[in-house]
Amino acid sequence: MAVNVTGADLVILVPMLGRWDRLPRLLHSAFAATPEAQVWLLVSEDDASGRAHLDPARINDGRVVASLVDSRAGTSGDYARKINHGAAHSDRDWIFTGAIDLCFCSDWYAQAARVQHATGALVVGTNNLCNPRTAGTYRGSAHSTHSLFARSYVNERGTADVLGRIYHEGYVHEFVDDEAVRTARYRGVYAHAEHSRVEHLHPACGKEATDPVYRQQGRRIGLGRAEFDRRKHLWGGDG
């Protein structure tokens, strides 16, 4: 399955947790690069502030879709749960696991398409211009924090142990991407598109001011690492 560079086959999933001021930048770059893509904004049902930002004049217009996510699902993984919800309720052939603090470079999807066409990969990684692990080969293997997943892969393979999901919901946030990339690599269906640039405007690389959500990262990393280590036997122990 080859990707369509206009984005007619693409849904970009964006879990929301504040930072609504960054939405115009995200949408502008997404639609400039892929004018026929859909962007799904995934908001927890109990997020009153988030629901208040859903502008009926702009949301659910066919290109931008808002979807409310059950916040009582009983798992710790807010980001993973929202991504999995978006994957389950959308219908485009290719799913991009996004975030509000991204900026899409103009040829990102064309570059990802080139790699997918050449390799037949079902999961294609991108370069976030922030984390050096995403810039190509890093200590023997490339990583991707925000990736393209073929819907067929999600439906037929899923996570390391659950069909129909992109991310394991046992992570608070960090390491969801590590598990997904390593699982796809273990299955032989991952390719890295180092020239597919989706910039992560993150404080860790000096591209954004910190805020309370970012500051929680240090506390969460140890929890994520422990969960990753507990599960890594599922993808051959890589990591």
Predicted features along the sequence, with ranges:
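Short beta-strand-to-loop element that shapes/binds the nucleotide-sugar donor at the catalytic cleft/hinge
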Residues: 122-141
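Short, acidic, metal-binding catalytic loop of nucleotide-sugar glycosyltransferases
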Residues: 25-38
